[in-house]
């Protein structure tokens, strides 16, 4: 029944004239009949009593009217038919939504609504309670208590329903909020050799994405090609830089310069140096800002590779060198001091570990394992035992003779051997020596401390011995490597024999003065221009001079030896390409001239040119790492 119908019916009821006494009597008869039927069914708790007065009958009438017809209920309060028109207007309130109003068509014999008994004592005024009997009063109190309990249960249920509704609303708002302004896309985890297209939604910011979204970096592993193409909406978003690991070709095409630079991590293995689109080759071990439009900073952790060991064009035999040979060269280039420091650090860590494993000295456990209090049973037992012993001693004291008592009294008390005291709570005897309690515990603590110190000292001595052994081993290894390096450092004997006579001939004949400044300038400029040409071409340039012909013959002689068979002059590759391309000044020599020849330098331009030509064929192969230290 709707609220409007309830309001109209209540207004009609208020507009009706006051009921006469006959009408009241008729209604009273009807309601008593209905209430008697209810009592037979056992659903009603209100019993009509003949001993009750007129007020009691009126109370029952109003109760039955409120429960049977249900039309007089305008809220939670009852409707008294004797009230005037103004009182009804003042008491009229809008019905609450929790009240279920019954229609006239329903039978009064169905007093249950939603399983609850609706026969309630609505009029609980003080007069009615005073006039009613004690049994009636107790019944009313019980019923009111039940109603209160039911209302409390209903309130708890409503609170729980409200909480569940709030939780459902929160869970329903979460997916909608995820598609809202705070979009967090999880990073795609890509493994293996995969090609991620530029149109993929995980790496491309589409125009339909809502601004303010935060995209974590895509985690890319292995040899992948990632081409991230950001749309024009990238300026309103926080796009994290992609993490690139390994030898990946990372092509970045950005329409706006707001994207962060890619973070280039170290390669997992020795691979050729990476080439970024529109940039120059990044040499390993260097950190450069590449000349891309968005000024991305490419950070590369240095790792030795085959392509990063040379800065210029390399000979074909050296370009085919494997990464393992390069790694061996780098490993050999490590200084023994660094190895020694690493070994010392490992020893120190091991010493710390052993020191932590040594347990600290623990004090001895006290023998009295209880507190002397009256709440402790063991202490009470001991007190009782002491009382018993004392009683026995007192009873037996009369039987002991005077001589025995004198002997007991004349006995000297104990004295501590260490501290010479004659009083303690407990005497200790160890090896015939009587000691007090304090001295005994202090001796035990000292012994434990000495044992702990000896353990620590033994651990330190062991670590020191290991460190000394390691230093001796490293010294032996250093001596061995120095002797191995000293052997190839000596120049070839045939080269020495060639050099010395040529020098003597040059100084004897006095042809050193024939060379003028212009010829030396021309020779040095031609050498600097054609440093990548064949050695034959270099030698033909100076064929006018007899000294250069002698040097050419020395070159041919050296090239025939077995040790230098790999550097044959007939190859079309330039041997000068193994060193740096530096423009040579007048009579300038290279920085890595052999130490055996550095002693014979003179101020003469002829000698400097001869030294340069002879140094073109080194006596030993210079390692590749020597040019890039």
Swiss-Prot record:
UniProt-annotated stretches for the region Disordered: 1-115, 169-216, 560-581
Chain spans, region CR2: 335-478
Modified residues (Omega-N-methylarginine): 221, 245, 253, 268, 280, 536
Chain spans, region CR1: 140-174
Phosphoserine sites (modified residues): 96, 103, 109-110, 133, 270, 335, 338, 509, 543, 545, 553, 594
Main function: Transcriptional repressor. Acts as a component of the histone deacetylase NuRD complex which participates in the remodeling of chromatin. Enhances MBD2-mediated repression. Efficient repression requires the presence of GATAD2B.
ZnF GATA-type span: 410-462
GO molecular function: protein-macromolecule adaptor activity; zinc ion binding
Keyword terms of this UniProt record: Chromosome, Coiled coil, Isopeptide bond, Metal-binding, Methylation, Nucleus, Phosphoprotein, Repressor, Transcription, Transcription regulation, Ubl conjugation, Zinc, Zinc-finger
Main location: nucleus
Biased composition (Basic and acidic residues): 25-35, 82-95
Keyword Ubl conjugation: yes
Chain residue ranges for the region called Interaction with ZMYND8: 177-290
Subcellular location: Nucleus speckle; Nucleus; Chromosome
Protein name: Transcriptional repressor p66 alpha
Lineage top rank: taxon: Eukaryota
Recorded coiled-coil stretches: 135-170
Residues in cross-link Glycyl lysine isopeptide (Lys-Gly) (interchain with G-Cter in SUMO2): 89, 174, 200, 229, 462, 485, 547, 581, 601
Modified residues (Asymmetric dimethylarginine): 536
Complex formation: Homooligomer. Component of the nucleosome remodeling and deacetylase (NuRD) repressor complex, composed of core proteins MTA1, MTA2, MTA3, RBBP4, RBBP7, HDAC1, HDAC2, MBD2, MBD3, and peripherally associated proteins CDK2AP1, CDK2AP2, GATAD2A, GATAD2B, CHD3, CHD4 and CHD5. The exact stoichiometry of the NuRD complex is unknown, and some subunits such as MBD2 and MBD3, GATAD2A and GATAD2B, and CHD3, CHD4 and CHD5 define mutually exclusive NuRD complexes. Component of the MeCP1 histone deacetylase complex. Interacts with CDK2AP1. Interacts with CHD4. Interacts with ERCC6. Interacts with HDAC1.
Keyword Amino-acid biosynthesis appears in the UniProt entry: no
Organism encoding this protein: Mus musculus
Location of Phosphothreonine modifications: 20, 185
GO CC annotation terms, alphabetical: nuclear speck; nucleus; NuRD complex
């Amino acid at each position: 029944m709707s609220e409007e119908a309830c309001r109209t019916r209540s207004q009609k009821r208020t507009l009706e004239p006051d009921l006469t006494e006959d009408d009241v009597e008729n209604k009273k008869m009807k309601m008593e009949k209905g209430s008697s039927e209810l009592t037979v069914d056992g659903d009603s708790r209100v019993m009509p009593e003949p001993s009750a007065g007129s007020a009691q009958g009126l109370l029952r009438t109003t109760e039955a009217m409120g429960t049977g017809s249900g039309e007089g209920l305008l809220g939670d309060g009852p409707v008294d038919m004797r009230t005037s028109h103004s009182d009804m207007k003042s008491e009229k309130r809008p019905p609450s939504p929790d009240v279920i109003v019954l229609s006239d068509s329903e039978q009064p014999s169905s007093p249950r609504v939603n399983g609850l008994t609706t026969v309630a004592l609505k009029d609980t005024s003080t007069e009615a309670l005073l006039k009613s009997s004690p049994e009636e009063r107790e019944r009313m109190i019980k019923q009111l208590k039940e109603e209160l309990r039911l209302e409390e249960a209903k309130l708890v249920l409503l609170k729980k329903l409200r909480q569940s509704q709030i939780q459902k609303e929160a869970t329903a708002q979460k997916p909608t909020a995820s598609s809202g302004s705070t979009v967090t896309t999880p990073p795609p985890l890509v493994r293996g050799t995969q090609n991620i297209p530029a149109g993929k939604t995980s790496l491309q910011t589409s125009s339909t994405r809502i601004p303010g979204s935060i995209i974590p970096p895509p985690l890319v592993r292995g040899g992948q090609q990632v081409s991230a193409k950001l749309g024009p909406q990238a300026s309103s978003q926080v796009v994290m830089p992609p993490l690139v690991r390994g030898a990946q070709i990372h092509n970045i095409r950005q329409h706006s310069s707001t994207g962060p630079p890619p973070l280039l991590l170290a390669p997992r293995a020795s691979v050729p140096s990476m080439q970024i689109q529109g940039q120059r080759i990044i040499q390993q071990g260097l950190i450069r800002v590449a000349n891309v439009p968005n000024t991305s900073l490419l950070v590369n952790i240095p790792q030795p590779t085959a392509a990063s060991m040379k800065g210029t064009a390399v000979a074909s035999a050296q370009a085919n060198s494997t990464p393992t040979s390069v790694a061996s060269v780098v490993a050999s280039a490590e200084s023994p001091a660094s190895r020694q420091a690493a070994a010392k650090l490992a020893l120190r860590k091991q010493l710390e570990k052993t020191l932590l494993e040594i347990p600290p000295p623990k004090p001895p456990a006290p023998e009295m394992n209880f507190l002397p209090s009256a709440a402790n049973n063991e202490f009470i037992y001991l007190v009782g035992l002491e009382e018993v012993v004392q009683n026995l001693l007192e009873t037996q004291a009369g039987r002991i003779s005077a001589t025995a008592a004198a002997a007991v009294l004349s006995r000297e008390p104990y004295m501590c051997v260490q501290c010479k005291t004659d009083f303690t709570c407990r005497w200790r005897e160890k090896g015939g020596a009587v000691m007090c309690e304090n001295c005994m515990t202090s001796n035990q603590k000292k012994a434990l401390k000495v044992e702990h110190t000896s353990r620590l000292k033994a651990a330190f001595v062991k670590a020191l011995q290991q460190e000394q052994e390691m230093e001796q081993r490293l010294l032996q290894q250093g001596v061995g490597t120095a002797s191995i390096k000293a052997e190839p450092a000596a120049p070839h004997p045939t080269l020495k024999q060639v050099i010395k006579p040529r020098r003597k001939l040059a100084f004897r004949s006095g042809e050193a003065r024939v060379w003028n400044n212009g010829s030396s300038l021309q020779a040095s400029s031609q050498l600097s221009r054609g440093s990548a040409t064949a050695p034959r071409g270099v030698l033909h340039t100076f064929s006018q001079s007899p000294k250069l012909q002698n040097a050419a013959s020395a070159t041919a002689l050296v090239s025939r030896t077995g040790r230098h068979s790999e550097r044959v002059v007939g190859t079309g590759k330039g041997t000068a390409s193994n060193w740096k391309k530096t423009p040579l000044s007048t009579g300038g020599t290279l920085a890595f001239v052999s130490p055996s020849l550095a002693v014979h330098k003179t101020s003469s331009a002829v000698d400097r040119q001869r030294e340069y030509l002879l140094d073109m064929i080194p006596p030993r192969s210079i390692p590749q790492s020597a040019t890039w230290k």
